């Protein structure tokens, strides 16, 4: 038996038959025995043969299958029982060839059958303890805890499912309530706005300034003045040219002049109608006076007077008695003539009106 070492310092066993004596022997070879057998070795510098014997590790620290996967250890199966008994007794149990050998051969290697059985049982028990400890360490809980955990999870899942089924109904109820509340608020706001707008039509809002009285008489006077000012604004819009006037006195004078000019135009038109049909005698003064009285009784503005309304009321047969060969003048023509007369100032001269005869013709000059 001889020992050999490679460059990395790895050691192995080698056997051979001596040609001279026919004795089988076991030697150390450079084949790495732990490269494939034991994946738990952290580095390649550690020698399992030397360190295992020096540290005094027992067979219970190593799995029996470590040597079973190593093809280099299967060569011990054909050894004779008496040839290597001394070497096998001193060799650690982790390097024994359990893979290809039976129970009787292992006993022959170790010197007795009882010793081999004890080693095998010790290895199996240590392997089972190791796996049990590792499982407990990974789980970190007792079997009772493992059983209670699924029950708690199942209860929590049931509660979650029930809440999820109830949530859509609650959400729908809440959305309907919000919609109803919004509608009720909108209706209340509309009613309040309508109730606020209705009283504004019935009264005039007056703000009391500093130095002004707030009793009922003074407030009534202020309301009356406010109404007068509104009517003045209406007249100002009807009369042309009054928008540029600021003073009330000047504006009233302009309105009076405009009304007088309208009266003169009405007189002129009535005379013109008399010339068309001489048989009709029209008392213009009486008609105008009656129309003015009616307008005052109805509290209608004077500017809204229709000059032809009195003619139709007092002379209902005017259209029947007129000569059919003369067509009635259209309203647009009458308006254009009135404007021309107003611009020319023809009506403003009273001597011109006196030159007309009662029947509408000019008087001969003497």
Swiss-Prot record:
<dbReference type="GO" id="GO:0006355">
    <property type="term" value="P:regulation of DNA-templated transcription"/>
</dbReference>
<dbReference type="InterPro" id="IPR036638">
    <property type="entry name" value="HLH_DNA-bd_sf"/>
</dbReference>
<feature type="region of interest" description="Disordered">
    <location>
        <begin position="123"/>
        <end position="201"/>
    </location>
</feature>
<feature type="compositionally biased region" description="Basic and acidic residues">
    <location>
        <begin position="123"/>
        <end position="134"/>
    </location>
</feature>
<dbReference type="InterPro" id="IPR011598">
    <property type="entry name" value="bHLH_dom"/>
</dbReference>
<dbReference type="GO" id="GO:0009637">
    <property type="term" value="P:response to blue light"/>
</dbReference>
<keyword id="KW-0804">Transcription</keyword>
<feature type="compositionally biased region" description="Basic and acidic residues">
    <location>
        <begin position="159"/>
        <end position="170"/>
    </location>
</feature>
<dbReference type="GO" id="GO:0005634">
    <property type="term" value="C:nucleus"/>
</dbReference>
<keyword id="KW-0539">Nucleus</keyword>
<dbReference type="GO" id="GO:0003700">
    <property type="term" value="F:DNA-binding transcription factor activity"/>
</dbReference>
<feature type="region of interest" description="Disordered">
    <location>
        <begin position="1"/>
        <end position="20"/>
    </location>
</feature>
<comment type="subunit">
    <text>Homodimer. Interacts with IBH1. Binds reversibly to CRY2 after blue light illumination.</text>
</comment>
<dbReference type="GO" id="GO:0046983">
    <property type="term" value="F:protein dimerization activity"/>
</dbReference>
<feature type="compositionally biased region" description="Gly residues">
    <location>
        <begin position="1"/>
        <end position="11"/>
    </location>
</feature>
<keyword id="KW-0805">Transcription regulation</keyword>
<dbReference type="GO" id="GO:0000976">
    <property type="term" value="F:transcription cis-regulatory region binding"/>
</dbReference>
<feature type="domain" description="bHLH">
    <location>
        <begin position="212"/>
        <end position="262"/>
    </location>
</feature>
<protein>
    <recommendedName>
        <fullName>Transcription factor bHLH74</fullName>
    </recommendedName>
</protein>
<keyword id="KW-0238">DNA-binding</keyword>
<comment type="function">
    <text>Transcriptional activator involved in cell elongation. Regulates the expression of a subset of genes involved in cell expansion by binding to the G-box motif. Binds to chromatin DNA of the FT gene and promotes its expression, and thus triggers flowering in response to blue light.</text>
</comment>
<dbReference type="Pfam" id="PF00010">
    <property type="entry name" value="HLH"/>
</dbReference>
<keyword id="KW-0341">Growth regulation</keyword>
<dbReference type="InterPro" id="IPR024097">
    <property type="entry name" value="bHLH_ZIP_TF"/>
</dbReference>
